[in-house]
Amino acid sequence: QNALLKPRVALCVPSAITDVESRAVVEAAVKAGARKVYLIEEPVAAAIGAKIDISKPSGHLVLDIGGGTADIAVLSLNGIVQKESIKLGGDKFDQAVVRYLRERYGLLIGEKMAEMVKREIGTVGREPGNEVFDVKGRNLTTGLPEKRSISAAELRPCLLEIAQQIVSAMQSVLERTPPELVGDIFTSGAVMTGGGSLLRGLDELIEEKLHIKAEVAESAEECVAIGT
């Protein structure tokens, strides 16, 4: 009877998770009441959620940027051919915004404000435009509330530094990928999922540096959940 009541659970994990970490995740799920635990690597779930047919012998490149990590993988025949996971996700972009405002203006802002700034004017594109956002925080000198107008152009360098590291990791994965699959990827391009993939200009940066087209998947923020 207990077996019938306990659910089977599928959990997504970063592609670079270690055996020790995997066991810890499984044990935690079992202690929480799971009967059976299945671990799915995030790029696989993201690809399925993005409606990519990974069952065929052709190669597909997926970039999934979550809150804490960016997972890159080349997928083919229902498996991962090459992969890399780096600890650079949406949270790192937010932290970069916080650090810039603190160092440049002595303005302290919270995580929610940083994310709002990133979503409203954050870009790594070649032409950031003239957009401006009013940032509200606390002046570190006076301790009083303060508002400052920040432009997309001045914010771009701190975001670009992180984005370039992600693109470099993608290049590393491609360099280790068999030539025939690289040819497929040149045709199909890269599919981007996760909340971090919504950063404006990231697709342009990938296209410029890697010479392949890049496209944000439909419902990018939900792809991993859908694919699970």
Where does each model-flagged region fall?
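Nucleotide/phosphate-binding catalytic cleft detector across ATP-hydrolyzing
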Residues: 1-65, 73-191, 197-226
